[in-house]
Amino acid sequence: MFFQLPWLPEFILRRRDWALLVRVLRNTSSPGVFSDPDLEQYKQSWGKRGALTAMLNWYRAALVRPSKFALDSEASRVKLPALLIRGKNDQFVGEAMARESLHYCDDGHLEMLETATHWVQHEQPAQVNTLLSQFFA
């Protein structure tokens, strides 16, 4: 609910050279995944005008504005093939949530990468690329 506040999250996240966001990336990823140069690049991106608010607005909208489609309606179904790649050690998207997401897909597939976290594309890019190539083939 913290992100629902109008300006305080932006203020706090910018403090101390983005220390909280840097800590989140480092503490929720495998060691060494986000190097100091990577984090400097992230800080530059976060600092661009409107970028941080845009990041937070996704969470704000997801919690405040219910979807115009009921989750059990035909309009809410994903009819195209869908692939969800999840790290087994993801601290943000639980395994149950990932599996339940497939119930909204006519042709959904879940790939669990044993040693990855939420940042699966950063931690195991070759494996993610292989899975995507196979999926789109």
Model-identified regions with their sequence ranges:
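Flexible "cap/lid" subdomain of the alpha/beta-hydrolase fold that forms the substrate-access gate
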Residues: 1-112, 133-134
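Catalytic active-site module of serine/aspartate enzymes centered on a nucleophile-bearing elbow/loop
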Residues: 107-137
